[in-house]
Amino acid sequence: LRNPFPPIADYGFLSDCENTCLISSSGSVEWLCVPRPDSPSVFGAILDRGAGHFRLAPYGVSVPSARRYLPGSLILETTWQTHTGWLIVREALVMGPWHDLEARSRTHRRTPMDWDAEHILLRTVRCVSGTVELTMTCQPAFDYHRVRAAWEYSGPAYGEATARAVTDADAHPALRLTTSGRSGVSSLLPVTSRVASASP
């Protein structure tokens, strides 16, 4: 029997010095707990294939051509080749400048640095040659896959959607997905999108 779980060495590791996530070589976020690393998982497919994931990759391709961290950073860069073109995906957990200089933090036990976690997973896509059909599936599963998520559009168009827990929504974080493309939302189904990336 073929093991549905990739080797742990195949996962990319991202961190914003407050949180972490693991991304499989197939372009899927398979471990992320929010808002803290000791919170229940939102994406947990590394442990259970039905426990939530967030995949962003070319349609019909599951093995990238190359993968690396940009030098001196925790920005993961994945290069994909298809029969119609080349695509580069860059991913990072974002840090921003320290935002509150007037009051002490209620979440930090140590004196804060100049930078702080923004709690944003940023995934950028750039088509460098030809045209590539891209697929995105975002299927969170709150509380280690014990609570389903429901999606709804939260912006004026189709580029922003929010996922909330179906039961006891206040006890779980809300996830906001923003894209420059159009996302398909169907309440209890995952957010999906297939777009053709234009030429460079």
PLM features per residue range, with description:
Residues 2-200:
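Beta-sandwich/jelly-roll carbohydrate-recognition scaffolds of carbohydrate-active enzymes
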